Amino acid sequence: MYSSYSLSKRLVSIPILAIQLLLIRSVSSLNLTNDYLNHKCLVSQGKYRPGDKYEDNLNFLTREVLSYNFPTGFIHISYGEAPSFVAIILQCRGDSYDSKCLSCYATALSGLRRRCQRNKGRVIWYDQCFLFINSIRSSPRKNDYRNVFSMHNPNNMIEDTELFNKKTRDFLYELMLEATTPNRTMMLYAAGEKKLGTKKLYAMVQCAQDILRCKGCLEWSINELSKCCHGKQGARVLGTECTLRYELYPFLRS
């Protein structure tokens, strides 16, 4: 599917065996791909030591997440005071709510434990969710493009590249407007398909449900496509505030 990705130039240890045993069953039932995409250890936020108050707060929150059923596929919870303040933000893809979101949480939690051991700030992206653990209080969140990266399908469009790019941008703008209409503000998500000659274009846009300017984030991401992914048959732009993707094959649950 994807053989390469590029990071934008602007661009835990959680010893809870019970959580992992509880969640592993739901992970195995996930039929669609949930590949690891990228991660970032936020070294500027420092690290915590085993047994300190930050670790206690982190373990409390990771257990607390299990009490949610994720009807909209999103959670932003926090606990404690600086320097032991912890926030967890989990945003699942719009078609991955309820138990499917919990499955992605288990995968992401395990992934962060391996890749960013004891970092207070860290984020990881998978096909179906991103998990952001943070030690800085910020709610609602402003758009921050430092933790953004892009990926693209290795295959290029052979003909009518400019027309394909234009129609793709236009379709993404349509979905952006749909996702940000007043009756969709709880999900901030839209997906669809559009016929392009003999082909079909599949696309989705989504914002995390705690950001101030969803439309501004998606507009910025759509503009990034011309820099990273010109003429590509598929691409994504992912961050901690919003994400978008398009392909010439279906990649979402119906």
From Swiss-Prot:
Location (main, coarse): secreted
Subcellular location(s) of the protein: Secreted
InterPro entries for the chain: CRR_secretory_protein, GNK2, GNK2_sf
Keyword Repeat among record annotations: yes
Keywords: Repeat, Secreted, Signal
CDD domains, alphabetized: Gnk2-like (cd23509)
GO CC annotation: extracellular region
Signal peptide: 1-29
Every Gnk2-homologous domain range: 36-138, 145-251
Keyword Coiled coil: no
Top-level taxonomic group: Eukaryota
Alphabetized Pfam families for the sequence: Stress-antifung (PF01657)
Protein family: Belongs to the cysteine-rich repeat secretory protein family.
Protein name, per record: Putative cysteine-rich repeat secretory protein 37
Organism this protein belongs to: Arabidopsis thaliana (Mouse-ear cress)
